[in-house]
Amino acid sequence: VGALALTVAGLGVVVLAGWALDQERLTRVLPGLVTMQPATALDFTLLGLSTAMLHLGWARARVPEAVPLLAVLTVVLIAGTGLVTELAGWRYPITVLGDMSQNEGRMSGITAVAHLVICVSLLAAVFGRRLVAHGAGVLALTLGVVGLSGYAFGASDLYDVGYFQTLALHTALGIALLGLALVSASGEVGLTRLARSGTVGGRLARTLLPAV
């Protein structure tokens, strides 16, 4: 869990550095692909650190719970603003360093939804709602895998699908990694319990998961 969370936080920091230093390879990965917007990178940094602080024992012992909660609420504000302004057709106010030619500088709609789902999982974990945290983690993982699958079959096809139009490759990867971290951190519930069981369903799940 910690390795996945800190990897995503590091991804956010690297992309923010790419914007600050005008290094397109860090923000876009490959020519022709969409960029990860600064707001998305900031969200990833906050979400990755929050996941680590809430789910790692040594971090929980040293960091007041209010710190990750404040980070999560900041993400809710950023992602919620992006989603609401896109749905309402309003001007997006957070445009610092952003690519204004791409969705007016805002993160993609599916990215905003995924970040809000991750926030739900983290908040549910804080309040002891393990099944809710697990379910939200599974949903985030699914959204990330769908995005990665779209790139596997061709970015041009993915960009034709609604709110996936401005989903960056490394954004999809970050969502999938955080979703996997949250599913792993939620304990023996839901899909995790099934995958670890000795039943026929468990054996089938363990067989299919690598293929997925």
Mark where each language-model region is.
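Non-catalytic regulatory/interaction regions at protein termini and inter-domain linkers
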Residues: 1-212
